[in-house]
Each structure stands twice: as structure tokens, then as C-alpha cells.
Amino acid sequence: MSEKKHSCEEKSLQLYPLSNKIRHVNPNISALPSETDISESLTNDLTKLEISNYAPFNRDLETFSDLIFGLTNIQKKSLYSLQLGRSRGYALYSDENEKYLWSINTKITSTEQREVLLVKSNNKKFDTSIVLKHTHLSSKSQNEKKARVKVFRQEIWALKTLSHPCVVQLLNYYVSSAELILVENYCMGGDLYHYTKKHHSDFSLEFVGRIFSELVHTVAYLHSKCLIHRDLKLENILLTQPYNVIKTIDNWKNYPNALIQISDFELSIFVDSKNHLVQSSCGSQEYAPPEVYMGIAHDGFRADAWSLGIVLFALLEGRLPFDSYPTLDPENVRIKRYVQRLVRCDYTWHLCKSPFKRSTGNTNDNDDPSWRFRLFVKKLLKNRDQRSTPTELLKDFNKHGNFTLPLLENVTI
């Protein structure tokens, strides 16, 4: 796809506010800033910024979209980054009344690459929170800046392409020579890793089935757009509701809203619609199939499918399938044995094993409510040539009504 060139001229940062309407139309990908455009802007002077094509900041805030526009850098003021622990954080001053629109609530996560901040609105009309994913560029080399900008642009490109209730929503983004900021909706339940670690004993098969149904449908939707996530894991799956709400829901089949949202599209990539071939390896090793672990070219759709199998196993068992119990063996020995189990697809059920002893001849799996979950794991944690894809799993879902969701009936795949 040819990229449309944008002239940076006197602008040292570019802001691209998004509204809910833009979210639901066919996105103009060519209108996104190219890697060259942003790299050029990294060398310009911030003081040369002029933005004149946005509405005056002191207008009345009528909608949530108006509030998001409060993150737009207009006239003489800019986004301020203050230390956590102070009473004010990421916010924009109004030229009229010098009041903050947003304040840092807490730091959700922090890595060498970027920090994720929970930001709360100070506007009493909108009692809401959003998430800022913030990357500092000032301390990085030029090559590091270009690499981070490339990843940042890929994430924007992916999120602008997608419109699905189980994918996080891109609200705004911000580019300057010093920082990259991604603004997304906030999921109150946190990530599935910490939720599973804390509340796994409360998981019902219906709850796990609901999560897995949404996951499979969403990943099949990504693949219909020729997009591979490449980093599907519990940490990148967010729950839209907190524990105190989830524990009160007893009918997951007819729950009207999305329970999960997939996030973190930094490593996602668009592929050819015919062979889905990916040359590079990335993502988390614990969720990567053997072909990715060994660094060979692979079918990206089937690699995502393997990750879904790992996630489902973890939801059922409360652990990852190829992890062994702690031993005193040297690390190189543990890694070697891990790879051996991985390649052989050698995992063992404990919590979700069949209650029937095959030697007795009692093999009526219809009386075992967990058998279909084990079957799905078996279809996903297989050799790549035999592994089911999410799209193929959807056909199985259509055969079994317990795995179809009214919520997603109108989403085209």
C-alpha cells in the first residue's frame, strides 16, 4: 500500500483527535502519519507548533467526545507531565480558567518501553476514566526513537482498522519529539492474568466459556482483516467489569455486553490474505507455538490460535500448560525440558481432567461438562499443520449453542 506523504512544515507534533463516528466508518489509513513524517517531526522544535483547525477550547463540553478533545494541545498550552504522588498529573490547562481537565489516578503498569496511566476526568459532568499509554522519547537514541515510532504507528493503524466490542477503543493519540501518547478506554476489571491469579477458584465453566467465546470471535474478526495480534496472552486481555460486578452475574449466555477486550496491538501485523506468512518472531514465549519459539517462518493465524489454546488452558487450570513444578535443576536443563514438552504438546490436566476412568468403560463424555473445553485445547495445542484456526473453531461454536453469543451476531467476519 502506498503511503501518502505529509508535509511537517512548521509543525513539530501532530494530533489526530478521534470521535465515535470516525470509529465506525471505513478508516482512511493513508491519512495516518507515515514513519518518515513522524521521524522528521522528531527533529523539529516544539515551539513552532500551530494548530488552528480545532474548535476553541473554552467551548461548553456537551459530550464525551468533547471531553476527549480536552487532550488536544490548543493555542499556547500543552500537556504537562508531573510526578506521580502530586495532586495533578497529565492534564491540559484551559486558557480561560486555568483548570485541569484530567488528573493521574494511578500508574497501572510501567516498563522500559512505556508506562500505562489511569487518568480521571475532573469534569463533574463526566465521571469517567481513560487510559494513557505514554512513551518517553527524550532519553532514547535516534534509532530507538524510530523503532518506537514504528511500533506506535502500527498500533494506531491496527486500532483504526478495527471496530469490535471486544477490542479496546482508540480515543486519541499524540506525537511529539519528546513523547508518544495513546489514549484508550478504561476496562475496570483489569487484565485477565491478575484476575485469574486472584479469583481462579471462583471461575465457573460458564464464565470461562463466555471469555473463550468472545476471544475466538474477536481473533477470527482480526484475521478477517488480515491482522495478526502476535501477543495474545492473559495480560493483554482486559475485563470490562470488576470482580464485585462479575460475581453477581449468573447467566453468561445472555449477558448483553462485552466481558473482555483485547489490547496491546504493538506487535500486530497485517499479512497477505492468502498465506498469512510471518517471517519474524515476537511475543511472549510462554504463549508462542513451537514454530515461533524456533524462529522459523510460520502461519500467523495458526500462531494466534496456539496462543488461544494456552489462554483457555490457563483459565481452566489456573496455570500454563508446559510449566513444570519448581525443581532444583539448572536453568538450561529446565528450558530444554520445557521445549521438549512444547514440541510434543505434552501437557497434563489436573483440575479439568475427565472424571471417568476409561478402564471402566464409562466413556459417556456428554455427562462431563468440561470435555468440550478439553477438546478445544486439543485442537489448538497441536502441530501447526493440524491446528485449528479461530475461524474454524467458530464453525464448531455454531454446532454447539452454548458457545454462540447474541452480542456478536451483528459483527461481520
Curated annotation (Swiss-Prot):
SUPFAM superfamilies: Protein kinase-like (PK-like)
Cysteine pairings via disulfide bonds: none
Binding, ATP: I108, T109, S110, T111, E112, Q113, R114, E115, V116, K133
Enzyme class at the top of the EC tree: transferase
Keywords, in A-Z order: ATP-binding, Cytoplasm, Kinase, Nucleotide-binding, Serine/threonine-protein kinase, Transferase
InterPro entries associated with the record: Kinase-like_dom_sf, Prot_kinase_dom, Ser/Thr_kinase_AS
Annotated catalysed reactions: L-seryl-[protein] + ATP = O-phospho-L-seryl-[protein] + ADP + H(+); L-threonyl-[protein] + ATP = O-phospho-L-threonyl-[protein] + ADP + H(+)
Domain Protein kinase: from-to ranges: 102-403
Active site: D231 (proton acceptor)
Domain of life from the UniProt record: Eukaryota
Gene Ontology CC annotations of this record: cytosol
Record EC number: 2.7.11.1
One of the record's GO molecular function terms: ATP binding
Predominant location category: cytoplasm
Subcellular location: Cytoplasm
Family of the protein in this entry: Belongs to the protein kinase superfamily. Ser/Thr protein kinase family.
Protein name as it appears in the record: Serine/threonine-protein kinase ppk27
